[in-house]
Structures are given as C-alpha cells and as structure tokens.
Amino acid sequence: GHVLSHNSGALRLLGVEEPEGEVNVLVLNREEPFRQAVDEVLSGHRSQQMLRLNGRCCQLLANPVMQGEEQMGAVMVLLDVTEQEQREDLRREFTANVSHELKTPLTSISGIAEIMQSGMVKAEDVQGFASDIYQEAQRLIALVEDIIRLSQLDEGAVNMEREDVDLFQLSLEVTKRLESAAQKNDVTIKTMGRSVQVHGVRRVLDEMIYNLCDNAIKYNRRGGTVAVTVGPVEGGVEVSVEDNGIGIPAEDQNRVFERFYRVDKSHSKDISGTGLGLSIVKHGAALHDGQIRLESTPGKGTTVTLLLPQG
C-alpha cells in the first residue's frame, strides 16, 4: 500500500523524514507490529497494535475505508500513550506493593490466631501472643491510613481549609509526641529556631514534619540525635530535620520519596513503618507549592529540608 497523505505528528513519532513522492507505507516502519497492522487493514480487517517508537509507547489503530463492498484504502492513526502506560505501570506496582505489605501482617495474625485456637498456647503465654496480634493489627491500620492519606493527596481530596500555622510551634508539638519513641531508640530529639508563619493545611504540615522526624529516629544509631531547625530564609521558610544516623547511599537518594521504597531492605525488616511516609512528605510539599532538599552521607547522617512559601 502507498501513502496518500500524512501529517507531521505521525512522521515525528515514526522518526522519519518527509517522504518524497509516492512511497510504500512499510518504508515508514518495518517493525513486526506495524507490518502486521498493514497486512490486516489491507485485508479489510481492523487492527490495533502497540509499538515502541524512539523510546515512546504508541498505539496504532488501523481501519479499512470501504465504499460499498469495495475497499478503497485504509486509515492508520498513531497515538502517543507513553504517559498513560507509565501511570498504569505505577498503578500495577503500587497494587503489588500494597498487596505484599497487607499480606505480611495478616499472615502473622492468622498464624498466631491458629496457634491459639489449637490450644497449644500456655496460659502464661496468651498475653504475649495477644500483644503480637495487637502490634500487627496496628501495623495494618497504619498502612491503610497512609494509603488513604496518599490517595487523598493524589486526588486533591484533602480538607483544603488553610490557616496561618506557626511552624516552630508545630515542630515543638511533633517532637514532643515523638519523645517516647526517641527514648526507646536511645536518640535525643530537639527543636531549634524561631516562630515563622505559613498559610497551609495544618494536618498535612503536621504529618510532613512527623514523618521526617519519625524516619530520622528509626534510621539513627544508638546515642544519636535528631535536630529540627525552623526559620526564615530567602524566598520563604525552612524546616530541616537533621540526624547523625546511618545515612543514604547516593544511588538511592533520588528514590527514597517513592512509595514503598526501602534503601536497605534487610535492615528495614527490623524497622516498623509503612514505606509511605516520605511519599506523603513529597505530596504534602507539592500541595503547599514547596520544595524538598535531601543531603546525606552514608555512615554520617541525613538532612531533609522543606522550603515553603511564607504565609
């Protein structure tokens, strides 16, 4: 079949120059899916194929053009569906990760309950088994709450009521709530700086600071410190959370804000958490037109800084 007409968008996706004169359609592309679509449509059948063209994911739709019973030609349409495919890949990955994260505590709960149901547990051990079930149930609740929160931030469904928030005071409240967790890990947590105002969603700002501090405690060392510093800077206000813990390798630093991403998976098994905390920080920063800066040296510690517009 020969090309009767085309547009520049199709040529751009195919990565070919403007053809001179009448050319065979297969000159444009000789990949098997393209050839199959041409064969099918010239035989009077509709065809739909997926193509990889110059790093882009494209959908090829081909339909015969009929006049009565006679086929007069065919129309082929190329659609760039790269972004849709990327979103679908992210959705599949997210679903797989959620399924795995849900299965782990559920398996533990089921196993413990089965042992208790069988009557194999001594009376003095029941309290310990019940405590294990409670801890796994709390882990499930935290995971579900984080998934819901992340979904709300994704869709902009968070209660968007904004107010003036003193970030220094908010940071003091957050570190106060985390003092017990810090003590259990032999970590000292402190807040420094002065009052600065932002106009934002208090609950989201609270969660952002909490998640950063919580991570700094969990991935710290015995006798370590977590320092939260709040203050004005050129262009807005900053909240930085600095620890002297295990640090993050350079190759992982661009990925730590991805959902469920764990830097050291073997070490992370011993650390509680949903794997969604930093992703919530990332989405919360975007909600407030803010920026995130991460600096880390393995073995020395990590500093995560939030830059937010001043209220």
Protein language model regions, located:
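PAS-family sensory/regulatory modules and their coupling/dimerization elements
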Residues: 19-83
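Short acidic helix/loop segment immediately C-terminal to the autophosphorylated histidine
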Residues: 117-124
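Short alpha-helical segment of the dimerization/phosphotransfer core of two-component systems
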Residues: 135-140
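Conserved micro-motifs of the catalytic ATP-binding
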Residues: 155-160, 193, 197-203
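Short conserved segments within the C-terminal catalytic ATPase subdomain
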Residues: 181-196
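Short conserved segment of the HATPase_c
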Residues: 248-262
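Conserved glycine-rich
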Residues: 289-290
